Design a protein with these regions (language model features):
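A short, charged, Gly/Pro-tolerant segment at domain boundaries
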Residues: 173-175
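Conserved G1/Walker A P-loop phosphate-binding module
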Residues: 1-60, 64-76, 80, 157-161, ...
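N-terminal, positively charged regions that mediate nucleic acid binding
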Residues: 150
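Conserved C-terminal guanine-recognition region of P-loop GTPase G domains, centered on the G4
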Residues: 36-43, 64-144, 154, 158-171
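Cofactor-binding loops of NAD(P)H-dependent oxidoreductases
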Residues: 24, 145-147
C-alpha cells in the first residue's frame, strides 16, 4: 500500500510485532515481520513493507529496496485507504500499486493477492463502494477492515491463512 494505508497498524493488530505507527508518511523505513497464529496450530509470517510511491520502480522513495522485499513474498495484500481523509482515490491507488509492481518485475503481478480496504472506522462510503465495485468487476478478492477496531480482521486472517496454506501445498506438490 501507499504510505499511511494502515500496513503497520494491521501487522500490530494480527501479530506480536510492534512497529512504529504514526500519522505521517514513511514511518516504516525497514520491513517488519510478524508471526500470525490462526486456528489451533497454524500460522504464517507477515511482512509490513514500507509504503510504495508513484515511481517506486524507478527508485523513488527507496522503491528498489522495498520492491525487492515484496519479491520474496508468496501472497500479497494490497492495502488501500478508504478513509474520509485519504489522499488518493482508492481505485487509482490500487492501480498505481499494480503498475509499480509490473514495472519493476512483471512476474510480481502473477502472485496471488487480495485487495483490502482499510480504515473502515473512518471510511468514506463512496470510496469503499467504488473499490468494492471495481474488485467485483475484475473478480479480485476483496476484504474491508479496520485494524483499529478489529472489524473484519479475524475474517481477513482466516482468509490469508487459507491462501498461504494453498500456496504451500502447491509448492509441496511441485517438489
Amino acid at each position: 500500500g501507499f504510505p499511511n494505508a494502515g500496513k503497520s497498524t494491521l501487522i500490530a493488530a494480527i501479530s506480536a510485532a510492534r512497529p512504529k505507527i504514526a500519522d505521517y508518511p514513511f514511518t516504516t523505513l525497514v520491513p517488519n515481520l510478524g508471526m500470525v497464529r490462526w486456528g489451533e496450530d497454524r500460522g504464517f509470517v507477515v511482512a509490513d513493507i514500507p509504503g510504495l510511491v508513484t515511481g517506486a520502480h524507478e527508485g523513488k522513495g527507496l522503491g528498489f529496496q522495498f520492491l525487492r522485499h515484496i519479491d520474496r513474498t508468496s501472497f500479497l495484500l494490497h492495502l488501500v485507504d478508504v478513509s474520509l481523509w485519504a489522499t488518493e482515490e482508492p481505485v487509482s491507488s490500487f492501480e498505481t500499486m499494480r503498475h509499480e509492481l509490473a514495472s519493476f518485475d512483471e512476474s510480481m503481478t502473477s502472485k496471488p493477492f487480495a485487495v483490502v480496504a482499510t480504515k473502515l472506522d473512518i471510511r468514506s462510503e463512496e470510496r469503499l463502494e467504488a473499490l468494492r465495485a471495481y474488485c467485483r468487476r475484475h473478480q479480485f478478492p476483496f476484504h474491508a477492515i479496520s485494524a483499529a477496531t478489529r472489524e473484519g480482521v479475524d475474517e481477513l486472517v482466516a482468509y490469508v491463512g487459507r491462501q498461504v496454506e494453498s500456496v504451500r501445498q502447491g509448492c509441496a506438490t511441485q517438489s
